């Protein structure tokens, strides 16, 4: 018989990998997985750095916007106060002109005071400051009136009898409530 007919013991079976080949293939797979994981890590670290930078920029933009808004509010308040003060200057001028007339009669003083009061009220209205002056017999409004006293009367309870001091609204907000006397419950 020839030597080729007997299978050799050192020769591996065809189709089945040897343990060394399995180990090498497993090591190659692990190396590929490690390489892929390292590449993903580098990508994720770059993305993290990019997101952290974007966050810091957005935070800085927000702080700058807040600072600009605060500055704008401060400027608006300052301008509103300046505008209001400027609108009062003609009233001051009228008072000073009236006081400069040393020989004015009581009637002239009264006319000057009436004109100056009218000028002041016009200025207040132009600046959205409106009187609260409830009519006698009107219903008591706790949002705009402050009851100072109660008096017995024939009218319905909580009805305004008299106004002791006018109140004022500024842009639909109570600056000072009107001080009123109201009817007591029967």
Swiss-Prot record:
Name a GO CC annotation attached to this entry: cytosol
Q: Which stretches are tagged as biased composition: Polar residues?
A: 1-13
Tell me which Pfam families the record gives. Answer: GrpE
Subcellular compartments: Cytoplasm
Q: State if Cytoplasm is listed as a keyword.
A: yes
| Assigned keywords, A-Z | Chaperone, Cytoplasm, Stress response
Region feature (Disordered): 1-22
Q: What is its main location?
A: cytoplasm
UniProt GO BP: protein folding
At the top level, the lineage of the source is Bacteria
> Which Gene Ontology terms cover its molecular function?
adenyl-nucleotide exchange factor activity; protein homodimerization activity; protein-folding chaperone binding; unfolded protein binding
Please name the InterPro entries in this protein's record.
GrpE, GrpE_coiled_coil, GrpE_head
Protein purpose: Participates actively in the response to hyperosmotic and heat shock by preventing the aggregation of stress-denatured proteins, in association with DnaK and GrpE. It is the nucleotide exchange factor for DnaK and may function as a thermosensor. Unfolded proteins bind initially to DnaJ; upon interaction with the DnaJ-bound protein, DnaK hydrolyzes its bound ATP, resulting in the formation of a stable complex. GrpE releases ADP from DnaK; ATP binding to DnaK triggers the release of the substrate protein, thus completing the reaction cycle.
- What is said about its interaction partners and assembly? Homodimer.
Similarity field:
Belongs to the GrpE family.
Name listed for the protein in its UniProt record: Protein GrpE
The species this protein was found in: Polaromonas sp. (strain JS666 / ATCC BAA-500)
Gene name, please?
grpE
């Amino acid at each position: 018989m020839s030597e080729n007919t007997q299978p050799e013991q050192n020769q591996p079976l065809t189709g089945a990998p040897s343990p060394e080949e399995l180990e090498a293939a497993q090591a190659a797979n692990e190396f590929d997985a490690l390489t892929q994981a390292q590449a993903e890590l580098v990508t994720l670290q770059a993305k993290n750095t990019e997101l952290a930078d974007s966050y810091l920029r957005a935070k800085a933009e927000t702080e700058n916007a807040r600072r600009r808004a605060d500055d704008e509010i401060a400027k608006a308040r300052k301008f509103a106060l300046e505008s209001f003060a400027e609108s009062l200057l003609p009233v001051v001028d009228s008072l000073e002109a009236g006081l400069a007339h040393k020989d004015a009669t009581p009637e002239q003083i009264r006319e000057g005071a009436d004109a100056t009061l009218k000028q002041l009220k016009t200025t207040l209205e132009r600046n959205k400051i409106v009187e609260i002056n409830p009519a006698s017999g009107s219903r008591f409004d706790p949002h705009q009136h402050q009851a100072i006293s109660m008096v017995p009367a024939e009218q319905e309870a909580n009805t305004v009898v008299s106004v002791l001091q006018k109140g004022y609204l500024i842009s639909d907000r109570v600056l000072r409530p009107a001080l009123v006397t109201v009817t007591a419950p029967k």
